Amino acid sequence: VSIATERAAKAGVLVKDRLALEAMRTVDAVLFDKTGTLTVGAPVVAAVHAVGRSDDEVLALAAAAETDSEHPLAKAILRRAAERGIQVQQAHDFSSSPAVGVSALVEGRRVQVGGPHLLSQETATALPVSETWASSGATILHVLVDGEPIGALQVADEIRPESRAAVEALRQRGVTVVMITGDARAVAESVAADLGIERVFAGVRPEDKAGKVQELQREGRTVAMVGDGVNDAPALAQADVGIAIGAGTDVAIGSAGVILAGDDPRAVVSVIELSRGAYRKMKQNLWWAAGYNLVAVPLAAGTLAAAGVTLPMSVGAILMSLSTVVVALNAQLLRRLDLDPASVTRRQRA
C-alpha cells in the first residue's frame, strides 16, 4: 500500500485516505459533476436575446445584478459586458441562492438572473429561444425585471477534450458513468450525449447531490464522486470514494479521500488501475507466502529427518529471508505501472 500511495503521488494523485485507494478497485459507478470537471469550467457568454430592449441593456442589467457574485457564470457575464464596453451600474440588496440565481436592486427595480429553478420560483415562462439554445448544450440564464423575463443569456462551457476518452475508458472497464448538474435536463442531456454518458441527474440543487449519491448506493453500487466545488463537498463525503480535482475549492479537497493534482478526468481511470494493480500484488504475495511457508516450515521443523533429509540452520535462515525478499521485490514492480492518463486510456483501447 505504501508503494502504491508513493507511486500515486508521483503521478499527481494524492491519496489522503488509504481505504479510499483500496475501495477504488471495487468502484462500479463514477458520478461526475459537470461544470469544471467534465467541462473546462471557464464559461463564456455566447449569445444574448432581448425582449423589448436592446441586447446591451439586458447584458448591462445582468452584469449589475451579478457584480457581487463569485460564481463562474457571473464572471463570464461581467467579462462579456466589459468586452462590449458596457458601463455596469451599481446594485444594492444583493442576494444569491445556490442553483437558483441572484437578485439585486438596480435603479430601484428588482433584477434577477438565474436558471430554470428561478423561473419556477417566480412562476415565469421561459423564452422560446431557450429551447433552441438548450439543444446546443449551453447553459441558459434568464434575466428578470420585477419578475418578468426581459431577456436570456446563452452561456457555453467547453467540454474538456479528455472527457470523452475518460468516459469510454471507464465504460470499457465495466464502470457506469453518471453525470450530475444543476442545469436544465435538455442542456444536461445534450452534453451527456456528446460524451456518451447514458445516465444523467439534471436540475439537481447543491443540497440534493449527496442524496443522488445515496440513490446510486441503494442500487448496490460502489460510488466514486468526482467534483471541484463547495457544492460538491457533501456528495464527496457521502460517496464510497470522494475524488476532488486539484483546481477544486478547499472545502471539496477537505471532503475527498483522493485528490487529483491536475484537471484531467482520465486520471480517475489511473486511480482505478493503481488500486487494482496494488490488489493483484497483495494477492500474489499472499499466495506466494502461504505456499512457500506450507513447504518450507515443515522442512525446517525436521518432518523429513526420518528419511535423511535435514536442513542446516544456516540454510533455514536463508530460506526464511528468501520469502520476504520475493514479496518485497514483487511489490516493487508496482513502480513500473504507467499511470499517465493518456497511456492508461490508450492501453485499454489497444
Residue ranges and their predicted role:
Residues 20-23, 86, 93-96, 132-136:
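Short loop/turn motifs at secondary-structure junctions and domain boundaries
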Residues 81, 91-101:
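Short, solvent-exposed loop/turn elements at beta->coil junctions and helix N-caps
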Residues 28-70, 100-178, 257-258, 329-337:
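ATP-driven catalytic headpiece of P-type ATPases
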